[in-house]
Amino acid sequence: MMITKTAIALIAIGNIFYAYRCIVGTRAFIDQYGMGDGSAFIIKLAGTFCAGLGFMLAYVLMTGIAGTWELFTYGFVQAALLTVVGYQTVNGPWAEVEGVKATKEGYMAPAIFAVLNAVVLLTGAETLYA
């Protein structure tokens, strides 16, 4: 159970980190990746999704993971999709737009989240599916 809870904590911390960067640190996020001011709303929108998941995971850590498999399945599917889309974007024409600073973070971070969610689904299966 320690591996499961550690993975959940890492996912929660990561999501809260990105939520903060997107919602509170929008300007720094825009400047870091050269996305332009028009991206502010979408960045904040992404931040709200990260915040929602981060807060739900923190709640699960405090109350127990029994019956919460859907939360981690969603986390896995979303992160796996973003890994593919992020890789295509970082290695596609968007990355060549003047001023854009595409980095591997666009697919490496979601890949790590996907792996962590898979770890939770596998190591916590006995409790998650109860």
Language model features with spans:
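Juxtamembrane helix-loop boundaries in multi-pass membrane proteins
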Residues: 35-50, 72-75, 99-113
